[in-house]
Amino acid sequence: MVKVGVNGFGRIGRLVTRAAFNSGKVDVVAINDPFIDLHYMVYMFQYDSTHGKFHGTVKAENGKLVINGKAITIFQERDPANIKWGDAGAEYVVESTGVFTTMEKAGAHLKGGAKRVIISAPSADAPMFVMGVNHEKYDNSLKIVSNASCTTNCLAPLAKVIHDHFGIVEGLMTTVHAITATQKTVDGPSGKLWRDGRGAAQNIIPASTGAAKAVGKVIPELNGKLTGMAFRVPTPNVSVVDLTCRLEKAAKYDDIKKVVKQASEGPLKGILGYTEDQVVSCDFNSATHSSTFDAGAGIALNDHFVKLISWYDNEFGYSNRVVDLMVHMASKE
């Protein structure tokens, strides 16, 4: 089982750790966070406003974080180059601070003895992988990879199924996205992105997202055919993608439902879900799929122009894919 270090114990860092313990697929051996001391880590890991209390034991003992009886080494370094991952036995590092997202910055982890780095965010220059879409293209020569964004992980599996069966001529995506840590509780300064600085709980905020264009990186045939934007809305978690696209081959909406359902039960099982229930966002809290197609919410204008809806837990679904990507990478060692 691959031994993992986590850099940054924020929403994704903590949930990747939860996903690792829930699945038992990877072994978390070290965590680095300069801003959270050990006893605070115990508290933050145990209690979660969104996903509820951790079902297991967590305590501080002999300077280590002990989860379900397993002792985890704690570092508090600000500079990734100074983290002694090798000493703790960490082979792979999940870079989840949101700060070190380039090859150069994430590469600093390799200096401390890590063998590979998985950036839990989109990256300007690191190769991006989406489980179920292009993970097979990963090869051992790559030391630093990106797991793309939660939204790309929702959109890409759906886009792949649709494109493989009917061909996507072009498409626009909107994600109606839950609040994240980068937003403000009340109006405040936000650099050049003025709207992003408005109160998160009070507003629907139009925002940019690179998620749709990033699909073109993981599915090269769709490069230049998709773009999109986001609306940030006042919900704490769970987001939904609206993909409106023009199809090359004529398809009835029932045909689309059929192929998505088949994919959800076959090659994309566990990644792409399918539901015909009358669901709302809360129903996907703590869901582990990357994307769940909402058969009842989509509409077709005609046989070539459709609007497709897919839900995702932008925190926990994504965190589970980070774990899955590491398992896949380890299988290639």
UniProtKB/Swiss-Prot annotation:
The modification N6-acetyllysine is found at residues 59, 192, 217, 225, 252. It is found in: Cytoplasm, Cytosol; Cytoplasm, Cytoskeleton; Nucleus. Residues 1-146 are annotated as: Interaction with WARS1. Pfam families: Gp_dh_C, Gp_dh_N. ISGylated. S-nitrosylation of Cys-150 leads to interaction with SIAH1, followed by translocation to the nucleus S-nitrosylation of Cys-245 is induced by interferon-gamma and LDL(ox) implicating the iNOS-S100A8/9 transnitrosylase complex and seems to prevent interaction with phosphorylated RPL13A and to interfere with GAIT complex activity. One of its GO terms (cellular component) is cytosol. NAD(+) binds at residues 11-12, 33, 78, 120, 314. SMART domains: Gp_dh_N. The modification Deamidated asparagine is found at residues 7, 62, 68, 147, 153, 223, 314. The modification Phosphoserine is found at residues 120, 146, 149, 239, 310, 331. The modification N6,N6-dimethyllysine is found at residues 3, 64, 192, 213, 225, 258, 261, 332. The modification ADP-ribosylcysteine is found at residue 150. There is a cross-link at residue 184 (Glycyl lysine isopeptide (Lys-Gly) (interchain with G-Cter in SUMO2)). The modification Cysteine persulfide is found at residue 150. Homotetramer. Interacts with TPPP; the interaction is direct. Interacts (when S-nitrosylated) with SIAH1; leading to nuclear translocation. Interacts with RILPL1/GOSPEL, leading to prevent the interaction between GAPDH and SIAH1 and prevent nuclear translocation. Interacts with CHP1; the interaction increases the binding of CHP1 with microtubules. Associates with microtubules. Interacts with EIF1AD, USP25, PRKCI and WARS1. Interacts with phosphorylated RPL13A; inhibited by oxidatively-modified low-densitity lipoprotein (LDL(ox)). Component of the GAIT complex. PANTHER family: GLYCERALDEHYDE 3-PHOSPHATE DEHYDROGENASE, GLYCERALDEHYDE-3-PHOSPHATE DEHYDROGENASE. Belongs to the glyceraldehyde-3-phosphate dehydrogenase family. This is Glyceraldehyde-3-phosphate dehydrogenase. It comes from Oryctolagus cuniculus (Rabbit).
